Amino acid sequence: MKPKTQREVKGGLFLISETRPEQVFTPEDFNEEQLMMKEAVIEFVDREVWPNKERFEKKDYALTESLMKKAGELGFLSIPVPENYGGMGMGFVSTMLVCDYISGATGSLSTAFGAHTGIGILPILLYGTEAQKQAYLPKLASGEWFGSYCLTEPGAGSDANSGKTKAVLSKAGTHYEITGQKMWISNAGFASLFIVFARIENDKNITGFIVPLEENNGIELGEEENKLGI
């Protein structure tokens, strides 16, 4: 009799599992460390974000990049990243505290922040190899690099798995060559690392690839879309 194996679910578990009472938290449950983080992010938003709200909505991407770097210096980008990868390892509640206050100020900065700390960092944190985590997470956690998540295509949005971008193993077998087009990619204009989804030959599902921005990797960026400053 073969032993039963259960696949580990990484990310999105809240979508398929029941919420337990011990998982529920309220502001009254915040500990001293979380309250300190709350005060720090409120001060950052009041000083740096609110006074510049109109500039964000008018496509001032240089300002967005500048404040993202400041957020990295203050540790706001590294909260969910474990300490051994250059992060603060403060957990879910502290992460949500920071996201809550940053997202309440302007959709432009909150989108850049969420794209970096969420779909930019988490794919590597949850699914990357140990070597990939050591190589990329410290740079993303500090704000030295910004991440971008390249999923949507001109003909693939809600049905993301229908994307046409292809990944073909090189003749030497050392790397994959990716060909395709992506669109509406948050942070693409100032990202140093892209999580690019492509299909390997006839695979049923698409695969995520870590693609650093380098001169010889063939990435071409199109013109920025005017989407309410996002």
What are these regions (language model features)?
Residues 111-131, 157-160, 169:
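N-terminal glycine-rich flavin-associated loop
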Residues 152-154, 168, 197-201:
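A generic structural motif
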Residues 174-223:
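A short core secondary-structure module
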Residues 34, 45, 75, 82, ...:
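Buried hydrophobic positions in well-ordered alpha/beta secondary-structure cores of metabolic enzymes
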Residues 227-230:
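Short, intrinsically disordered, charge-balanced linker/junction segments flanking boundaries
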Residues 70, 159-179:
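Cytochrome P450 C-terminal beta-domain/meander region
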Residues 143-151:
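A short, Trp-centered hydrophobic/proline-enriched beta-strand micro-motif
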Residues 1-112, 132-135, 139:
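Amphipathic, small/basic residue-rich leader segments at the start of a protein or domain
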